[in-house]
Protein backbone atom coordinates (compact mmCIF):
# COMPACT_ATOMS: atom_id res chain seq x y z
CA UNK A 1 0.00 0.00 0.00
CA UNK A 2 1.28 3.50 -0.82
CA UNK A 3 2.23 6.03 1.84
CA UNK A 4 -0.85 8.04 2.85
CA UNK A 5 -0.17 11.48 4.35
CA UNK A 6 -3.61 11.45 6.03
CA UNK A 7 -2.85 8.30 8.05
CA UNK A 8 -1.14 8.38 11.45
CA UNK A 9 2.59 8.56 10.82
CA UNK A 10 5.70 8.19 12.98
CA UNK A 11 8.36 10.87 12.53
CA UNK A 12 12.11 10.36 12.64
CA UNK A 13 14.18 13.57 12.70
CA UNK A 14 17.94 13.46 12.38
CA UNK A 15 21.15 14.18 10.49
CA UNK A 16 21.67 10.56 9.37
CA UNK A 17 25.41 11.16 8.72
CA UNK A 18 25.50 8.35 7.55
CA UNK A 19 22.42 6.13 7.83
CA UNK A 20 23.46 2.93 9.65
CA UNK A 21 22.06 -0.25 11.22
CA UNK A 22 21.08 1.59 14.41
CA UNK A 23 18.92 3.95 12.37
CA UNK A 24 17.36 0.97 10.60
CA UNK A 25 16.52 -0.62 13.97
CA UNK A 26 14.89 2.64 15.08
CA UNK A 27 12.98 2.82 11.77
CA UNK A 28 11.57 -0.66 12.37
CA UNK A 29 10.36 0.36 15.85
CA UNK A 30 8.81 3.57 14.49
CA UNK A 31 7.16 1.68 11.64
CA UNK A 32 5.61 -0.75 14.13
CA UNK A 33 3.95 2.22 15.89
CA UNK A 34 1.87 3.46 12.94
CA UNK A 35 2.64 1.47 9.80
CA UNK A 36 4.40 4.36 8.05
CA UNK A 37 7.26 6.74 8.80
CA UNK A 38 8.27 10.24 7.72
CA UNK A 39 12.07 10.44 7.83
CA UNK A 40 13.08 14.08 8.19
CA UNK A 41 16.64 14.98 7.22
CA UNK A 42 18.01 18.10 8.93
CA UNK A 43 19.67 20.45 6.42
CA UNK A 44 23.21 20.24 7.83
CA UNK A 45 25.27 18.92 4.90
CA UNK A 46 28.69 20.58 4.93
CA UNK A 47 28.02 22.63 8.09
CA UNK A 48 30.64 22.77 10.84
CA UNK A 49 29.29 23.17 14.41
CA UNK A 50 27.69 26.54 15.11
CA UNK A 51 26.16 28.06 18.25
CA UNK A 52 22.37 27.84 18.23
CA UNK A 53 21.94 29.50 21.62
CA UNK A 54 20.74 27.99 24.87
CA UNK A 55 23.65 25.55 24.98
CA UNK A 56 22.57 23.85 21.75
CA UNK A 57 24.59 23.53 18.59
CA UNK A 58 23.01 24.04 15.20
CA UNK A 59 24.85 20.95 14.03
CA UNK A 60 27.50 18.60 15.22
CA UNK A 61 31.01 19.14 13.87
CA UNK A 62 31.00 16.57 11.09
CA UNK A 63 28.31 16.63 8.40
CA UNK A 64 30.01 15.50 5.19
CA UNK A 65 26.91 14.24 3.39
CA UNK A 66 24.53 16.47 1.43
CA UNK A 67 20.79 15.79 1.36
CA UNK A 68 20.80 13.78 -1.89
CA UNK A 69 23.55 11.50 -0.54
CA UNK A 70 21.72 11.06 2.77
CA UNK A 71 18.48 10.29 0.94
CA UNK A 72 20.19 7.66 -1.24
CA UNK A 73 21.90 6.08 1.80
CA UNK A 74 18.51 5.79 3.52
CA UNK A 75 16.80 4.34 0.44
CA UNK A 76 19.62 1.83 -0.10
CA UNK A 77 19.79 0.89 3.59
CA UNK A 78 16.06 0.28 3.90
CA UNK A 79 15.80 -1.53 0.55
CA UNK A 80 18.10 -4.22 1.99
CA UNK A 81 15.28 -4.95 4.45
CA UNK A 82 12.49 -4.89 1.88
CA UNK A 83 11.24 -1.33 2.54
CA UNK A 84 10.46 1.10 -0.26
CA UNK A 85 10.26 4.89 -0.35
CA UNK A 86 6.71 5.99 -1.06
CA UNK A 87 5.32 2.81 0.47
CA UNK A 88 6.32 2.41 4.13
CA UNK A 89 8.11 5.76 4.35
CA UNK A 90 8.82 9.15 2.83
CA UNK A 91 11.95 11.26 3.16
CA UNK A 92 11.96 15.03 3.36
CA UNK A 93 14.58 17.67 3.91
CA UNK A 94 13.74 20.06 6.74
CA UNK A 95 15.49 23.12 8.19
CA UNK A 96 18.26 22.57 10.72
CA UNK A 97 15.82 22.01 13.59
CA UNK A 98 17.52 22.21 17.01
CA UNK A 99 14.46 22.58 19.25
CA UNK A 100 10.92 21.22 19.26
CA UNK A 101 8.57 23.33 21.39
CA UNK A 102 4.97 22.71 22.34
CA UNK A 103 2.64 24.17 24.94
CA UNK A 104 0.15 21.44 25.86
CA UNK A 105 -1.24 18.14 24.70
CA UNK A 106 -1.38 18.49 20.94
CA UNK A 107 -2.34 15.01 19.74
CA UNK A 108 1.05 13.35 19.42
CA UNK A 109 3.67 11.81 21.67
CA UNK A 110 7.45 11.72 21.89
CA UNK A 111 8.75 8.15 22.09
CA UNK A 112 12.30 7.14 22.94
CA UNK A 113 12.89 3.50 22.01
CA UNK A 114 15.40 1.40 23.94
CA UNK A 115 17.18 -0.45 21.16
CA UNK A 116 19.63 -2.26 23.42
CA UNK A 117 23.33 -1.75 24.07
CA UNK A 118 24.49 -3.34 20.81
CA UNK A 119 22.46 -0.88 18.73
CA UNK A 120 23.17 2.12 20.99
CA UNK A 121 26.89 1.40 20.65
CA UNK A 122 26.76 1.96 16.87
CA UNK A 123 28.56 5.24 16.28
CA UNK A 124 28.21 7.33 13.13
CA UNK A 125 31.34 9.21 14.26
CA UNK A 126 33.30 5.93 14.18
CA UNK A 127 31.70 4.98 10.85
CA UNK A 128 32.75 8.31 9.29
CA UNK A 129 36.29 7.88 10.69
CA UNK A 130 36.52 4.39 9.16
CA UNK A 131 35.15 5.69 5.85
CA UNK A 132 37.91 8.32 5.82
CA UNK A 133 40.60 5.82 6.83
CA UNK A 134 39.60 3.51 3.99
CA UNK A 135 39.36 6.33 1.43
CA UNK A 136 35.58 6.10 0.91
CA UNK A 137 35.13 9.59 2.36
CA UNK A 138 37.63 12.43 2.10
CA UNK A 139 38.22 14.96 4.85
CA UNK A 140 36.39 17.73 2.98
CA UNK A 141 33.15 15.82 2.55
CA UNK A 142 32.11 12.84 0.51
Please report, for each region that a protein language model flagged, where it lies by residue.
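Nucleotidyltransferase catalytic core that binds NTPs
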Residues: 1-142
